[in-house]
Amino acid sequence: MPPQRFHEQFDQIQRSMPDVPLAMGPDDAAEFMYEKGVVLVRDGEEAQVVEDAVRAHFTAAPDLDQEQVRRAGPLTNRSGITRIRVADPGEGGRDGDRAVVHALRSVREHESRAGRRMAARNHVVHIAVNACPGDEPVPAPLSEPPNPAAAGTPHDPATSVGVLVVDTGLMHDYRSCGLLAHTEGDAQVRERDDRGILQQYVGHGTFIAGLVAAVAPNTDITVRGSLDDAGAVLESEFGEKLFEAVDASGWPDILSLSAGTSNGRTDGLLGVETFMRELRAQRTLLVAAAGNNGSDNPFWPAAYAALPGWEDSVLSVGALRSDGESGACFTNHGPWVKVYAPGERLTAPLTGFDSPVPYVYQHSTYDACRYGSGYGCTCQSPAHSGVLSDEGNAAKPDQVMFEGYAQWSGTSFATPVTAGLVAARMTAHKERDPRAARRQLLASEAGSAQVRGVGVPALRPPTWRPVPVVRQAPGL
């Protein structure tokens, strides 16, 4: 049986959130994860309207328990949202939540009259394998330079561009990498497990910072470890995490975000609605990953780039494969993805600069591309066995040692490459407005690539080295 990446990752994230029972959706499909027994609403009068509507609907249904319907909190917060409990979250399995589905149906008439959504699932926002990293990291040869290589622009504190990365924290040895000399921020909370093995997703934020620094050396990079818990956070907390990050560091020139979720909708993510309105009123440019589901379904908050009013403040980024000619097999796509950049087999700092660090693979590779592509993609190569894919099997999971740099793939990494290109444009043209730099960059420097047979705008850093792809023979 081939690996079941989404289900494997669901189990991993559920283990990281033991007190929050999760389900997958929509219904029994494996597209996103959400909190069981709860719906998310705007606080204030609207929350009361939803609570009353759900209670009335459940009272009329003999197999639904209206006694379970109550406010779960918080009563209010800066994001302007609250949770309403609609069922015992401990009941039922992981394949959907019938009570949540009924609760959402119960407010449809109210939503129709109001002209907007009033309730939503409380999704898990994450950097997981089916979301932003397209694979797991691979040790880079010690002789191999970063890719993209470091540009030659000097760092000037008087003109440097501020870049905020909201992700996992910085690894303990990041200062041993000269590329990260102008990076600061939160430390990774727990890098290794009890056996001394590197935990999954740690180093994600460090890798991202390294890509920004390589493409745009004249940057001051701040990394906030808002997603240190297996790279996941509930939507109800995500907006608060973003506000906390900008409160701690100030609104930056560029906010690089390599996390998100789909939600089966085209009108945004309720949990970040207030933050996104505040972002629009600032001068900050949000550069956000389009996600790695190989899908055209909107992935939030990146897909805000296609909503009226946010076209100038959000730039959504898909990933090119290693030769830069076409989209990577995993990249999300569609008109809501505004630009593509290299995102496959990039080389940047991870950990192990002071001493080697062991890592055991969690997911096994596939025999063929899980998205149907015909080249030797990271679904298949380099081949390895993983703990989560081979539970109960005799196959021993593969272990590697990291000694500084790694190769990694995903729209997670095409995003900081693009953020770096915007920052580099600001430096080269003495442009202080990041949104103006974005417009200028796309107008004057974007080339083209093919994604699912469609021509799309593509950005390729001058110091990035294409890596030829290997074509698979038919039937392999």
Please identify what each model-predicted range represents.
Residues T378, F413-H429:
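Short, small-residue alpha-helix embedded
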Residues M1-D52, A56, M118-A131:
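Autoinhibitory N-terminal propeptides
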Residues T76-G162, Y174-C177, D398:
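Protease zymogen maturation seam
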Residues P252-A259, S313-V314, V387, M401-Y405, ...:
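C-terminal subdomain of the subtilisin-like protease fold in secreted/lumenal serine endopeptidases
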Residues V212-E237, S258, E431-S448:
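Short helix-loop-beta-strand segments that form the rim/entrance of peptidase-like active sites
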Residues L227-S313, Q399-P416:
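Substrate-binding/access-modulating region of protease and related hydrolase catalytic domains
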Residues E136-D220, E237-I254, S258, F353-E403, ...:
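Active-site core segment of subtilase-fold serine proteases
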Residues R175, D267, A288-W336, T347-S409, ...:
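Active-site-adjacent substrate-recognition loops and nearby beta-strands
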